[in-house]
Amino acid sequence: MFNWNDYGNGIYGFDSGYVRPLLAAIHLIVEGSRCAIIDTGSNDSVDNIVAALHKVGLSEDAVDYVILTHIHLDHAGGAGLLMQKCPNAKLVVHPRGARHMAEPSKLIEGVSAVYGAEYVQKVYGKIMPIAAERIIEAPDNTIISLNKRELLCIDTPGHARHHICIIDKQTSSIFTGDMFGLSYRELDVNGKAFI
């Protein structure tokens, strides 16, 4: 597991392991014996998510929600595989992303057009569909109750039109996914972002 952080109040975070360290994070919110997972990374991240659950004393059966900030594959590519391992979980996703998680062929086609099919297969593996009845669409101001702990989903288009942020009302913590466009430290010039 990469860069494990216990933030207190049942909030844990760790690196997804996607491409390089500190590029994308996965979070657990634990309330009593129940858990919500925010973002999944790619299929390669799923074993680390399961290990994280076990680290906090929970099994895959304890997961009530897998919440995606958006459906880009660095944040959502492992959702289908994770949902197979978490039989009680519902997937929470922006309404614009829900159909792509139930039937990911157009999503895979679009990513393959940008990066190439070989790269997509190598980095993301097989993207698994999620049964529509396990998907909860989360338009602006949707409240998800995790063992009576309220998680507010807010529509935050910008990085993607299908992007949400999640506010844990108990701690006032916000889980932002990707809030900006692309910016990589390798492209910094004189200590400032080039793009």
Model-predicted segments: where are they?
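Conserved beta-strand hairpin/beta-sheet module of binuclear metal-dependent hydrolase folds
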Residues: 2-56, 166-176
